[in-house]
């Protein structure tokens, strides 16, 4: 049986944390900041964690990611 390959688009969007979790980056951060408040922009800078409901599916796409 062939090896399972890492989904390359997912590998560029998620990073593994030291405790085994997955870090993700937030949406709505590319343009149109004039319509957002300072508080919204500040919170969008921070990375988020992948939720438990999505974790198993995303982890299967990232087989080779360390």
UniProtKB/Swiss-Prot annotation:
Keywords: Ribonucleoprotein, Ribosomal protein
Cellular component GO terms held in the UniProt record: cytosolic large ribosomal subunit
Molecular-function GO terms, alphabetical: structural constituent of ribosome
Origin superkingdom: Bacteria
GO terms for biological process, alphabetical: translation
PROSITE patterns reported in the protein's UniProt record: RIBOSOMAL_L35 (PS00936)
Disulfide bonds: none
NCBIfam families documented for this protein: rpmI_bact
Protein name (Swiss-Prot/TrEMBL): Large ribosomal subunit protein bL35
Native organism taxonomy: Bacteria, Bacillati, Bacillota, Bacilli, Lactobacillales
């Amino acid at each position: 049986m062939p090896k399972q390959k890492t989904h390359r688009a997912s590998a560029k969007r998620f990073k593994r944390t030291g405790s085994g979790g997955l870090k993700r980056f937030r949406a709505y951060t590319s343009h149109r900041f004039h319509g957002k408040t300072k508080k919204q922009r500040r919170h969008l800078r921070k990375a988020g964690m992948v939720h438990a409901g999505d974790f198993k599916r995303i982890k299967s796409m990232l087989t080779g990611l360390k």
